[in-house]
Amino acid sequence: MANSNPFVPPSAVDVDLSAVAWGASRTMSDFETGMWRMEEAQPQLRSPIVAVEVLDRAPDWDRLLDAVEWASHVVPRIRMRAVEPAMQLGNPVWSVDPEFDIGYHLRRVRLPAPADFDHALRMCRHLATEPFDKARPPWSALLIEGLDDGRAVFVVKTHHSITDGMGGIQMMTLLHSRRPDPTPNKPDRTPPAPEHLSSVGAFGEEVVSEIRRAPSRIAKLVRGATNVAATAISSPFSTASEVLGYANSLRKIVTPPARSGSPLLHDRGLGRWFGTLEVGVPELKAGAKAAGGSLNDAYVAALLGGFHRYHEAFGQSVESIPMGMPISMRT
């Protein structure tokens, strides 16, 4: 169960600020750009990171505002919007929003009585399905108060282009302290200065960035080709096998699945439904061990089992469902 008032900017003892360096890149990576632009062509593929926390009671609103404001100093990406280069010639560039307003991104609502956790989940669903305003930093948070048992719900929605799941965990860690009382002399940083970057300016930055990266990319390519050639001479069959392996992996990524997948999910709309199922970690680990798998295996199996029951309820039968699995590339 959560602390009664966990939103206290932590001290240096609580968290290592160097652990949240994921917002340092000025330009989106190719993967992040794909996530950013994909939903324009296929809105059904929107997949924001949504974290829902159940709190013992509602935190002090002013302290929550201060905590999120502090986090925006420590992680400047929180204050940044994505600027598309002219005609999308290149990847979007992160730029400090000159009109950044913490009150726009962080809001609160009190549910009318009577209100239980299911009512709060409905509010979370609405937040999760609202498209981001791409002229602003792509994240939002909502404090939901008024539950009958005195609890509160805090939900945070972040676009995948900002960070991955691990980065989201680091972000939530920043907002939580190990003590209920305010922390004096907490580490802080000066917030980044506002920027007025246009699409033409973003394109210019992309061009300059590509020119600067060109020598290192060419050198890396030459070194890689030399290493491959040397390996091929000493072990030609091993090298050929590795090349074929990479080619097959690439083919699997870029080629659509041969199976049609789920007829129910294929024509899904933009709506979402939120529900919860509480399973203890010890029980999940025991089930995984009994089946000869890992904890992650058990989690994925439970999800697929839920999809199986969902299809059965609608009289549909599917043998397999294509799915994507995010993999952390952090070291």
Task: Please give the residue ranges for each predicted region.
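Soluble acyl-CoA-dependent acyltransferase catalytic core bearing the H(X)4D motif
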Residues: 2-33, 41, 48-331
